[in-house]
Structure formats: structure tokens, C-alpha cells
């Protein structure tokens, strides 16, 4: 049965949690969404197999033990990301079909990554020197969930330019969910201020202009053509767009482009055209021209 409780986050804050009472205990299963879509959070207990793991539970309505903090953040943040997509775009879960949204925390040991696996999210705990537990950042959770949205819409191939666009759209929706700064991952990085910046990609060794696109090998070692590197170029174009048009219009333009116009093999130039067309569809030629200028400024 649906219930409400609270939990302690990685940073020590107390947050409200939508939970469920089942089998004589409280579990991190959010049954509060009017659509009936469930958000469920599991613990892999440092395994990297047999996903999703054990449903996070408590004998009381409070989730306060230190081993539960990563789960509290994952559960709370994902509830916010679900609400963001539903309230702004009427999108019901990543697939718009109300599929349950699953996270597993404590993936592996000192694992320095978070990922969308195709049907759920996984979060490592970080090694403590580069990353702290990766569920502690709202923009990272939004980034991963957006990979799910992309998979079900444009389905951008994860290599070269389409892959860099896949990464960029995840960063941009990460920003739309956490607009207090232009950084991505600032709440989980230990040794540097953030992972990436939309306003200043070069701060984290990313190009911010097409003239500096890096042709990297399409291998695991080469980050599949540098998808996490070359995303700096469309990220800077997004920053330019948002500063010209504001969040409210920009997020509608980006969502329309992703869900209506982009295809698996879209290039940066295709993305520019898709975003210009989306702006024209929604807001007319003046705003479309501002989007065009935002991309011209990064050499595209």
C-alpha cells in the first residue's frame, strides 16, 4: 500500500519519500504518481550481476542508515525527474507507456560510473577520490533517464556524431532538471568542480566549436568516437540557445527535436536543422533565427 516516509541523503539532508508498505515492511516503491507508473529502487550490494538486486526496505517509514543514503538520493531524485517529464511534456515514464522506472545503487565496488542499461539505471559508489556515490546528483539522474527517453524516440546510435548528440541531449535535460548552474555532476565530483560544463566546455577538456571536433576511434578506448568529448559542441550551442530564449521555450524546442525530428544517424548539422524547425513549429521565425545563431556561433 502507498505510504509516505522520509530518508537521509548522501549530503545528510532529510527528504520526503514516496514509499510502499508490503510484506510487513516499508520499501522504496513510489506508488504516488497519478498515472500509476512505479519508481522502484534496489540495492546491488556491490555486485555487478543479477540486476536489479534487493528492494531497499526499512522496518519503519524512515530510511536513515548510512548504507541506504545512495538509495534515498536515487529514489528522491528520480521522482523529481519523472515529474519534470510529465509536467512539461505529459511524458509518462521514459517510454511514454508508463513502464516502471528502476534504479540499482551500490553497483560494483568503487565503481566510477552511472548508466542507463536499456531498461534501468545503475549507480556506482565512486572511488572516493574522483567520484562520490553517483546517485547524489539530480542532473546525473536526469541525464541517465534521458538516455531512456532517447532510446525510445530518436534512438541516436551511440557512436561518433549521433553518440555525441545522445550524450549532449542527456546533459541538456540534466540542466533543465537542475538549472541552478551550468555544470553537470557538480554534486558527485570530488577532485574537480564538475564533470562537464554547458557554458564553458573547454574547462573540462571538451571542444566548444566544430573547428575543434576530435576524430577519435570508434572503440571502447576511443569512447566510440569521443561521444563524451565532442558533446561539448552541441552543449555550447544549447547554452547559447537557453541564454537567448530561456529555459521554458528551450526545453520545449529540445524535446520536440528529440521526439519528432531526430533519427538514429543524425549528425550535428541534422540536430541544428531539427532544433531550428522545432523552434519554428512552436514559436515562429524570430525564435528559430535565434536557434540558428546559437549553432552558427559554434561553427555549424
Curated annotation (Swiss-Prot):
Record: residues binding Ca(2+) 2: 178, 181, 186
Keyword Aminoacyl-tRNA synthetase: no
GO biological process: proteolysis
Annotated binding of Ca(2+) 1, by residue: 139, 178, 181, 183, 186
Single GO molecular function: metalloendopeptidase activity
Pfam families noted in UniProt: Peptidase_M4, Peptidase_M4_C
InterPro entries, per database record: Peptidase_M4, Peptidase_M4/M1_CTD_sf, Peptidase_M4_C_domain, Peptidase_M4_domain, Zinc_Metalloprotease_M4
Subcellular location: Secreted
Binding positions for Zn(2+) per the UniProt entry: 143, 147, 167
Thermal response of activity: Thermolabile.
Protein keywords: Calcium, Hydrolase, Metal-binding, Metalloprotease, Protease, Secreted, Zinc
Any one GO cellular component localisation term in the record: extracellular region
Top EC group: hydrolase
Gene3D superfamilies assigned: 3.10.170.10, Neutral Protease Domain 2 (1.10.390.10)
PROSITE patterns, sorted: ZINC_PROTEASE (PS00142)
Family the entry assigns: Belongs to the peptidase M4 family.
Protein name, UniProt field: Neutral protease NprE
Amino acid at each position: 500500500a502507498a505510504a509516505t516516509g522520509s530518508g537521509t541523503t548522501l549530503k545528510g539532508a532529510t527528504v520526503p519519500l514516496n514509499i510502499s508498505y508490503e510484506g510487513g515492511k516499508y520499501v522504496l516503491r513510489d506508488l504516488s504518481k497519478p498515472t500509476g507508473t512505479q519508481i522502484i529502487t534496489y540495492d546491488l550490494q556491490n555486485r555487478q550481476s543479477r540486476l536489479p538486486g534487493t528492494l531497499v526496505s526499512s522496518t519503519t517509514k524512515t530510511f536513515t542508515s548510512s548504507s541506504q543514503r545512495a538509495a534515498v538520493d536515487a529514489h528522491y531524485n528520480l521522482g523529481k525527474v519523472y515529474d519534470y517529464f510529465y509536467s512539461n511534456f505529459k511524458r509518462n515514464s521514459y517510454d511514454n507507456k508508463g513502464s516502471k522506472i528502476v534504479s540499482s545503487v551500490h553497483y560494483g565496488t568503487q565503481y566510477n560510473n552511472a548508466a542507463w542499461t536499456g531498461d534501468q539505471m545503475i549507480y556506482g559508489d565512486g572511488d572516493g577520490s574522483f567520484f562520490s556515490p553517483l546517485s547524489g546528483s539530480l542532473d546525473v539522474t536526469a541525464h541517465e533517464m534521458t538516455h531512456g527517453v532517447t532510446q525510445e524516440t530518436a534512438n541516436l546510435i551511440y557512436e561518433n556524431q549521433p553518440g555525441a548528440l545522445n550524450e549532449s541531449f542527456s546533459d541538456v535535460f540534466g540542466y533543465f532538471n537542475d538549472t541552478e548552474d551550468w555544470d553537470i555532476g557538480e554534486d558527485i565530483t570530488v577532485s574537480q568542480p564538475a564533470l562537464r560544463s554547458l557554458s564553458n566546455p573547454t574547462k573540462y577538456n571538451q571542444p566548444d566549436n566544430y573547428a575543434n571536433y576530435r576524430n577519435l576511434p570508434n572503440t571502447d578506448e576511443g569512447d566510440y568516437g569521443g561521444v563524451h568529448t565532442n558533446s561539448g559542441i552541441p552543449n555550447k550551442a544549447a547554452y547559447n540557445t537557453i541564454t537567448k530564449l530561456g529555459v521554458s521555450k528551450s526545453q520545449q524546442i529540445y524535446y520536440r527535436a528529440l521526439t519528432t525530428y531526430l533519427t538514429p544517424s543524425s549528425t550535428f548539422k541534422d540536430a541544428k536543422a531539427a532544433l531550428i524547425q522545432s523552434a519554428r513549429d512552436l514559436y515562429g521565425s524570430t525564435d528559430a533565427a535565434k536557434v540558428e545563431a546559437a549553432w552558427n556561433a559554434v561553427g555549424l
